[in-house]
Amino acid sequence: MAEGETESPRPKKRGPYISSVTSQSVNVVIRGVVLFFIGVFLALVLNLLQIQRNVTLFPPDVITSIFSSAWWVPPCCGTASAVIGLLYPCIDRHLGEPHKFKREWSSVMRCVAVFVGINHASAKVDFDNNFQFSLTLAALSVGLWWTFDRSRSGFGLGVGIAFLATVVTQLLVYNGVYQYTSPDFLYVRSWLPCIFFAGGITMGNIGRQLAMYECKVIAEKSHQE
């Protein structure tokens, strides 16, 4: 090599641990964003279903309802969906119980369809009393968990999410931040916990499936390296 010529410095390669940590953190952010937009979309769709029952804050006009004064509701639902979807696989790893029951996208899509169907039933089907209505929705929600989840952690998180979300919703209503147009507020309270439980199970399944896809991609990259 001639004098005066300097060897160009080679780019330093990151170690496998740093690369893995970086890719995992980026994937978590991506999963969170995907879950957020899924939650926003489902919140808008389910709100349009509930308009048929006239129990939401929004006026009957469909287009106006999406851009009503309660604009913060879909983003809040999206944020909650992201937290729930990231929490489920995290709890599975912490407990050392990876969820392997019906781990394919077709099952997840059926779970979403059943969840929307439960919401549609709460908006369309009339019952003689609120207790009968609550019992039916509870059976449907537990059936959704049994069909698409069957994990103890999933059931426990679903119950916790339903309780916490119901309490927060009632506090918002009592403080005048949010309100329902339905004259029968007992009717609204009869289906809220069941809908929140089913929603938690649904978003948990989506989050688990996204996490499993991430693990497959990372495993394939590690084998290639």
UniProtKB/Swiss-Prot annotation:
It is found in: Endoplasmic reticulum membrane. One of its GO terms (biological process) is sterol biosynthetic process. It holds the Pfam family INSIG. Binds oxysterols in a pocket within their transmembrane domains and interacts with SCAP via transmembrane domains 3 and 4. InterPro entries: INSIG_fam. A motif (KxHxx) lies at residues 219-225. Residues 1-28, 89-103, 149-153, 208-225 are cytoplasmic. The modification Cysteine sulfenic acid (-SOH) is found at C215. The chain crosses the membrane at residues 29-51, 71-88, 104-126, 130-148, 154-175, 190-207. GO terms for molecular function: oxysterol binding; protein sequestering activity. There is a cross-link at C215 (Glycyl cysteine thioester (Cys-Gly) (interchain with G-Cter in ubiquitin)). Residues 52-70, 127-129, 176-189 are lumenal. One of its GO terms (cellular component) is SREBP-SCAP-Insig complex. The modification Phosphoserine is found at S151. Belongs to the INSIG family. This is Insulin-induced gene 2 protein. Keywords: Cholesterol metabolism, Endoplasmic reticulum, Lipid metabolism, Lipid-binding, Membrane, Oxidation, Phosphoprotein, Steroid metabolism, Sterol metabolism, Thioester bond, Transmembrane, Transmembrane helix, Ubl conjugation. Phosphorylation at Ser-151 by PCK1 reduces binding to oxysterol, disrupting the interaction between INSIG2 and SCAP, thereby promoting nuclear translocation of SREBP proteins (SREBF1/SREBP1 or SREBF2/SREBP2) and subsequent transcription of downstream lipogenesis-related genes. Polyubiquitinated by AMFR/gp78 at Cys-215 in some tissues such as adipose tissues, undifferentiated myoblasts and liver, leading to its degradation. In differentiated myotubes, Cys-215 oxidation prevents ubiquitination at the same site, resulting in protein stabilization. Interacts with SCAP; interaction is direct and only takes place in the presence of sterols; it prevents interaction between SCAP and the coat protein complex II (COPII). Associates with the SCAP-SREBP complex (composed of SCAP and SREBF1/SREBP1 or SREBF2/SREBP2); association is mediated via its interaction with SCAP and only takes place in the presence of sterols. Interacts with RNF139. Interacts with RNF145. It is a multi-pass membrane protein. The record marks F115 as: Required for the recognition of 25-hydroxycholesterol. Oxysterol-binding protein that mediates feedback control of cholesterol synthesis by controlling both endoplasmic reticulum to Golgi transport of SCAP and degradation of HMGCR. Acts as a negative regulator of cholesterol biosynthesis by mediating the retention of the SCAP-SREBP complex in the endoplasmic reticulum, thereby blocking the processing of sterol regulatory element-binding proteins (SREBPs) SREBF1/SREBP1 and SREBF2/SREBP2.
